[in-house]
Amino acid sequence: MFLWLAHFSNWLTGLNIFQYTTFRAVMAALTALAFSLMFGPWTIRRLTALKCGQAVRTDGPQTHLVKNGTPTMGGSLILTAITVSTLLWGNWANPYIWILLGVLLATGALGFYDDWRKVVYKDPNGVSAKFKMVWQSSVAIIASLALFYLAANSANNILIVPFFKQIALPLGVVGFLVLSYLTIVGTSNAVNLTDGLDGLATFPVVLVAAGLAIFAYASGHSQFAQYLQLPYVAGANEVVIFCTAMCGACLGFLWFNAYPAQVFMGDVGALALGAALGTVAVIVRQEFVLVIMGGLFVVEAVSVMLQVGWYKKTKKRIFLMAPIHHHYEQKGWKETQVVVRFWIITIVLVLIGLSTLKIR
């Protein structure tokens, strides 16, 4: 919205600063951060008054029993902060802004309904797996179709392979839709599985969003894209605004979500943030880079799939408990040790992902 002020720069020279992506990206991050910090205490009080307390698994680590009753659904604060900040600082004429907000809020609505059933109706299972998959699939397919249309118009219907500048595989409509669907739905569920310890998913989301913001900035400028051998995606520079808003909102939320957490994000936050990250990766054609940067999310999801699949086949477990962060807790790691060490791993993975900008 503030971008419109740049049109009045003829009357007031200083207003032309609003046309610069870097300025608006920084302001989007600060706005979302301030929003989360300002409304965080109110959100916690409101969730507590509504008795939206998290029910902790009795078969999980015994140290988690003290978390029982901690307010959940705090992800609604994150989504509101991202939406408000993006609308204030983003370009409303850019279709990617609306696709990202649509995916964020649609998957957030699913997570909200799931959380609401768990905490208000005391339904430990929440919505059925079938209902959740249908909802996620519908959102992902609609977003994928919209992105395919935009990608087809800009000749960016390709698959980029990191570290190899000569490999850019044409996907076609089926390949594009399948890859986009798997990226969006897969990342959504992977982040949700990661969100099991205080701050464990929140900071990695910040790191991955920041990394993808750099790719979006480079891809949205033809000269940078050409120099770095990236696909030029017209309008991708506005995706930076969304990514930095996500960073700011999550950092503000982390203030209250850090150990010992005063509030959990719940499915409303985790499902939405994961889907948004996946959508950003599809827009900038960096699905493989997302796998690298979000390696923590990948490992968490794979650990669950391996555990479930192996147990069904052999009645034995590979890990002491899945997702894998609980495995290390059972091995004696303190919760804060698991969280910080997984953060460090994510920092390294994001740096490796960024190195693909030059190592080709």
From Swiss-Prot:
Pathway assigned to this chain's UniProt record: Cell wall biogenesis; peptidoglycan biosynthesis
Reactions the enzyme catalyzes: UDP-N-acetyl-alpha-D-muramoyl-L-alanyl-gamma-D-glutamyl-meso-2,6-diaminopimeloyl-D-alanyl-D-alanine + di-trans,octa-cis-undecaprenyl phosphate = di-trans,octa-cis-undecaprenyl diphospho-N-acetyl-alpha-D-muramoyl-L-alanyl-D-glutamyl-meso-2,6-diaminopimeloyl-D-alanyl-D-alanine + UMP
First and last residue of the signal peptide: none
GO cellular component terms given for this protein: plasma membrane
Transmembrane segments: 24-44, 69-89, 92-112, 133-153, 158-178, 199-219, 239-259, 263-283, 288-308, 337-357
PROSITE patterns reported for this sequence: MRAY_1, MRAY_2
Entry's localization field: Cell inner membrane
MF (Gene Ontology): metal ion binding; phospho-N-acetylmuramoyl-pentapeptide-transferase activity; UDP-N-acetylmuramoyl-L-alanyl-D-glutamyl-meso-2,6-diaminopimelyl-D-alanyl-D-alanine:undecaprenyl-phosphate transferase activity
EC number of the protein: 2.7.8.13
InterPro entries: Glycosyl_transferase_4, PNAcMuramoyl-5peptid_Trfase, PNAcMuramoyl-5peptid_Trfase_CS
Pfam families: Glycos_transf_4
Superkingdom, natural source: Bacteria
Similarity comment: family membership: Belongs to the glycosyltransferase 4 family. MraY subfamily.
UniProt name for this protein: Phospho-N-acetylmuramoyl-pentapeptide-transferase
Organism: Neisseria meningitidis serogroup B (strain ATCC BAA-335 / MC58)
